[in-house]
């Protein structure tokens, strides 16, 4: 997972590689408004590790995105992705674009992403 952080007058902004765009959307939407939530997320990451090889999962439901953690994988998904969508209304040759709505990565990659965000935020905020 590749990512980049920048700083603007609005604070820290995350950008992620194409297959992981939803992680940037989640961080920019859910975490920048409530950075203390990272404490709870890191605690759940540790619970996932401690539970391994047994199954453990946790969900953080946000206003626009929800975060799903388990021992192996992290998924972030836009809450509106489950809204009913009539694909028959799409013109021929077009597809529904959802790359910014759902993404997956490993638990360790996700933890590294959050730690890099914290470090950048402390350095440039």
From Swiss-Prot:
Give the transmembrane ranges. none
Task: Spell out the protein name for this chain.
Answer: UPF0231 protein APL_0968
The organism is Actinobacillus pleuropneumoniae serotype 5b (strain L20)
Q: Which Pfam families match?
A: UPF0231
NCBIfam families (UniProt xref): PRK05248.1-2
Q: Which family does it belong to?
A: Belongs to the UPF0231 family.
Identify the taxonomic lineage of the organism of origin. Answer: Bacteria, Pseudomonadati, Pseudomonadota, Gammaproteobacteria, Pasteurellales
Q: Which InterPro entries match?
A: UPF0231
């Amino acid at each position: 997972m590749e990512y980049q952080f920048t700083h603007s007058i609005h604070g820290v902004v995350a950008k992620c590689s194409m297959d992981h765009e939803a992680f940037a959307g989640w961080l920019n939407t859910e975490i920048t408004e409530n950075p203390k939530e990272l404490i709870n997320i890191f605690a759940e990451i540790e619970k996932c590790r401690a539970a391994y090889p047994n199954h453990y999962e946790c969900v953080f439901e946000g206003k626009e995105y929800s975060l799903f953690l388990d021992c192996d994988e992290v998924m972030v998904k836009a809450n509106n992705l489950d809204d009913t969508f009539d694909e028959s209304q799409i013109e021929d040759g077009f597809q529904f674009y959802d790359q910014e709505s759902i993404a997956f990565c490993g638990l360790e990659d996700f933890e590294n992403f959050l730690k890099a965000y914290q470090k950048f935020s402390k350095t440039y905020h």
